[in-house]
């Protein structure tokens, strides 16, 4: 088992990474008599709910669960209310613990429920998708979507532990594995050129879910994110770099309708647009743009803007991005692979030109 620590003084917590951890009682920060509400969905429940429940009951916990509809389109206030209703009906108090058992959607909703219920209860992340394991389960971002924008209603709320059982990836559809690799590639692109080079060598090992490479990769991604979160928990500066491709990607998700493109797929195309824009602004070399595109293609990810979106369709969504300040668009761009920066007030004609260039690739 590997362990990465997120250092936030009294709110520090471990990220446990290994095979078969769902059944390992010692990784759960719980004790006899604790009340637990597991938030999951029907698909994940059929694979893993009994394993987690059995382990918690052996510890001596009282365990209940609530199962939410599946998919990004259900990351809503209505789903949040289902959690609150389940907690209240079962008389859960401020001493309860909420466990998110699922992917990024479940983690985001359950985390926001934990932040909100009776002004905050204990929260444990058990991410079961690659995207959630390397990204959304770490760092304390919780949210639900609004019809006008993704993740517009939420809070920063740290878990007390993240438990990553890499065996859960064996039941994921291949499309979900590929989508998760977009966030993996992002880490190399923004902050770690050596990791990017490692990915170029081992992307096929990751696609094949070879455990040795998978655990090493997940640990590296978690360490990069943990270091950034330690330095900038609430995204006042450096943490914004973790959003490479996300401003464009969120525009794609919102415009097409949540769930039509997976988050990682939209981020992959968003990274390509950001790379093309960086090149047009004179920063990123054409060779680095090509390397990024090649790696995304090897991960079976889209690198072209959707056929049904015009360049002009992006801007209204992008102007609602949380990084916009004083009405000015702020974008995460690249100077080189491994070196990202936040560009302020980029000329919109350059942005539109980059999107159009990415559209021509389809």
Curated annotation (Swiss-Prot):
Give the domain of life. Answer: Bacteria
| Assigned EC number | 4.2.3.4
Protein's UniProt keywords contain Lyase: yes
What cofactor does this chain's UniProt record say it requires? Co(2+); Zn(2+); NAD(+)
Q: Does the keyword Metal-binding apply?
A: yes
> InterPro entries in the record, alphabetically?
Dehydroquinate_synthase, DHQ_synth_AroB, DHQ_synth_fam, DHQS/DOIS_N, DHQS_C
Residues annotated as binding NAD(+):
70-75, 104-108, 128-129, 141, 150, 168-171
The record's principal subcellular location, in a coarse class, is: cytoplasm
- The broad enzyme category this protein falls into is lyase
Q: How is the cofactor bound?
A: Binds 1 divalent metal cation per subunit. Can use either Co(2+) or Zn(2+).
Q: Name one GO cellular component term.
A: cytoplasm
Q: Where does Zn(2+) bind?
A: 183, 246, 263
This protein's pathway: Metabolic intermediate biosynthesis; chorismate biosynthesis; chorismate from D-erythrose 4-phosphate and phosphoenolpyruvate: step 2/7
One Gene Ontology term of the molecular function aspect:
nucleotide binding
> Which reactions is this enzyme annotated as catalysing?
7-phospho-2-dehydro-3-deoxy-D-arabino-heptonate = 3-dehydroquinate + phosphate
User: Any idea which UniProt keywords this protein has?
Assistant: Amino-acid biosynthesis, Aromatic amino acid biosynthesis, Cobalt, Cytoplasm, Lyase, Metal-binding, NAD, Nucleotide-binding, Zinc
Location in the cell reads:
Cytoplasm
Any one biological process term the GO annotation gives? aromatic amino acid family biosynthetic process
What does the UniProt record say this protein does?
Answer: Catalyzes the conversion of 3-deoxy-D-arabino-heptulosonate 7-phosphate (DAHP) to dehydroquinate (DHQ).
> Its family?
Belongs to the sugar phosphate cyclases superfamily. Dehydroquinate synthase family.
What name is this protein filed under? 3-dehydroquinate synthase
Organism lineage reads as: Bacteria, Pseudomonadati, Pseudomonadota, Gammaproteobacteria, Pasteurellales
Q: Which gene encodes it?
A: aroB
């Amino acid at each position: 088992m590997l362990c990465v620590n997120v250092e936030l003084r009294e709110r520090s917590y471990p990220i446990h990474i290994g095979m078969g951890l769902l059944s390992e009682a010692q990784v759960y920060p719980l004790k006899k008599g604790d009340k637990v509400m597991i938030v999951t969905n029907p698909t994940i429940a059929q694979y893993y709910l009994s394993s987690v429940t059995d382990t918690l009951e052996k510890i001596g916990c009282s365990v209940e669960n609530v199962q939410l509809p599946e998919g990004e389109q259900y990351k809503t206030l209505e789903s949040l209310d289902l959690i609150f209703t389940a907690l209240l009906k079962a008389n859960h108090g401020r001493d309860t613990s909420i466990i998110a058992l699922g992917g990024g959607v479940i983690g985001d909703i359950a985390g926001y429920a934990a932040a909100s219920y009776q002004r905050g209860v204990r929260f444990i992340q058990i991410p079961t998708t690659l995207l959630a394991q390397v990204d959304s389960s770490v760092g304390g971002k919780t949210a639900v979507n609004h019809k006008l924008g993704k993740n517009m209603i939420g809070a920063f709320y740290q878990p007390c532990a993240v438990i990553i059982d890499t065996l859960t990836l064996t039941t994921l559809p291949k499309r979900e594995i590929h989508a998760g690799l977009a966030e993996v590639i992002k880490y190399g692109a923004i902050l770690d050129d050596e990791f990017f080079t490692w990915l170029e060598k081992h992307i096929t090992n990751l696609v094949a879910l070879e455990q040795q490479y998978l655990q090493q990769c997940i640990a590296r991604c978690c360490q990069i994110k943990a270091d950034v979160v330690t330095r900038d928990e609430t995204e006042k500066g450096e943490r914004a770099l973790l959003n490479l491709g996300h401003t464009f990607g969120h525009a794609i998700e919102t415009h097409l309708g949540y769930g039509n493109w997976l988050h990682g797929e939209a981020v992959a195309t968003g990274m390509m647009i950001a790379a093309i824009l960086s090149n047009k602004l004179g920063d990123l070399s054409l060779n680095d743009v090509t390397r990024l595109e090649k790696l995304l293609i090897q991960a079976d990810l889209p690198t072209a803007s959707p056929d049904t979106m015009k360049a002009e369709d992006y801007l209204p969504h992008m102007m609602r991005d949380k990084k916009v300040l004083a009405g000015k668009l702020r974008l995460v761009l690249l100077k080189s692979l491994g070196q990202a920066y936040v560009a302020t007030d980029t000329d919109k004609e350059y942005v539109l030109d980059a999107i159009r260039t990415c559209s021509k690739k389809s």
